[in-house]
Amino acid sequence: MKREIVIAFVVLHYKNMRDTLECIDSIRKLNFSDSYHIVVVDNDSCTLEEAKVLQEKADDFVQAQENLGFAKGNNLGIEKAKEYSPSFIAVINNDTVIEQDDFVNRIKKDYQKYRFDALGPKIITNGGESVNPFPAYKTKKQVEKAIRKSKQLISIYRSKCKRFLLRVYIRLKHILKKPKPLENGKCFQEDVSLHGCAIIFSRKYYKKYHDCFYQGTFLYHEEEFLELRRTKDRLKFIYDPKLEIFHKEGSSLNYSYNDNLYHKLIFREENILKSLQLLKKLMEEKEG
């Protein structure tokens, strides 16, 4: 008979063993009395030795037969977590670290008060900025503008000449325009879009939907598909800055502008473009 689980953590692993192990260890070190469960999903990136290590570290280790991307990979882990019928499922990036001992207690208190479907924590980054609440695109006009921008970036990244001009533009922009102080994420908010790198689903949410994340995307903009679901089904999404998690990446990227980087950026933008085009299609279907 399976023990009663208060919270299940789903961690999606892809190649970076150090981050994944630090993420798991941060959960294990937390001083809370509630029973918890850790599910690690490998997106078809582990060697046999790495898989063995993750099997030992996690409570459940699920190995995908191919790289499923963000949404499908996490949904695979969530399906495993559902077997334990936890009160909450926390889906967190493998490059996040939890250091807050009352993390689970805070989630429980928020649920008792708000009966949320999804909860987003304050996501602390190296740059000091909070990426929650997430500024999701909410209109077709915004999505169309983002599609045009994505196409432009793909064109720039494929041209050495355009890449050089982009570097000059960015450097001048940083010299001439001082960055504004970031104000996002200071106050508790309801009915907001939440960042996908750390999101807590309640039991009532994951029982309502077969797939917690929309299955159609590979990478990027999963938040907008959650936002469509939130508005359509009038779900309760809340953001609590008193609940905290550290995200190693954040938005403070140190660009080195080499050819390998641009291959990665092209891959990134191509997947962003696919997600945005799909989002636009769903918005049009909703209108019609």
Language-model-detected regions and their locations in the chain:
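A short, conserved alpha-helix in the catalytic core of glycosyltransferases
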Residues: V192-L243
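Conserved donor NDP-sugar-binding/catalytic core segment of glycosyltransferases
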Residues: Q100-F134, T139
